[in-house]
Structure formats: structure tokens, C-alpha cells
From Swiss-Prot:
It holds the Pfam family UPF0223. InterPro entries: BH2638-like_sf (IPR023324), UPF0223 (IPR007920). Signal peptide: none annotated. This is UPF0223 protein SAOUHSC_01044. The lineage of its organism: Bacteria, Bacillati, Bacillota, Bacilli, Bacillales. Gene3D superfamilies: BH2638-like (1.10.220.80). Belongs to the UPF0223 family.
């Protein structure tokens, strides 16, 4: 599916790619499953770019409106698994 990713035009190209990569991991979590370590690595990089909780919440809400995927719930679920575990959304 195609979504509009919440991108800040003040970010560098590398930062934009990293944020999109994180949201790709959120998509995989909901669609086919993702390794917890890979997901959390992408989230850690996302947090380097977006360290403020308020901004993170705003970006997550924008992505959820576009995709229907709740990034916050994905992060909270993946955090409860070991790095090598494959995690997918509960249906």
C-alpha cells in the first residue's frame, strides 16, 4: 500500500530515509511480522531524529491517519520481546 509518510522538510535526506525505514518496520509489524531487534534498531534511529515525545506523538498520529497503523502500540508490543523473536500484530 502507499501511504503519506510524515516528513519534516528540515530533515536531511538521510534522516528522511531513516524515518521512512522506521515506518516500513511498523508496516511489516502489521502485515507480515518483523524481527524485534530490527524493529527496535529502526526505532532507536527514529528517536535520534525525533527525540521529543510530543513531536513523536504528532508524527505517529499523522502516520496512523494515513495508514491505519498505530506505531505506539507496535513499539510497546515489540519492546516486550527478545531481539531475535519475530513479532507481528495480534489479529
Amino acid at each position: 500500500m502507499e501511504y503519506e509518510y510524515p516528513i519534516d522538510l528540515d530533515w536531511s535526506n538521510e534522516e528522511m530515509i531513516s524515518v521512512i525505514n522506521f515506518f516500513n518496520h511498523v508496516e511489516k509489524y502489521y502485515e507480515s511480522g518483523v524481527t524485534a531487534g530490527d524493529f527496535m534498531g529502526a526505532y532507536k534511529r527514529f528517536k535520534e531524529i525525533v527525540p521529543a515525545k510530543a513531536e513523536e506523538k504528532q508524527i505517529f498520529n499523522t502516520f496512523e491517519k494515513s495508514s491505519g497503523y498505530n506505531s505506539y502500540k507496535a513499539v510497546q508490543d515489540v519492546k516486550t520481546h527478545s531481539e531475535e523473536q519475530r513479532v507481528t500484530a495480534k489479529k
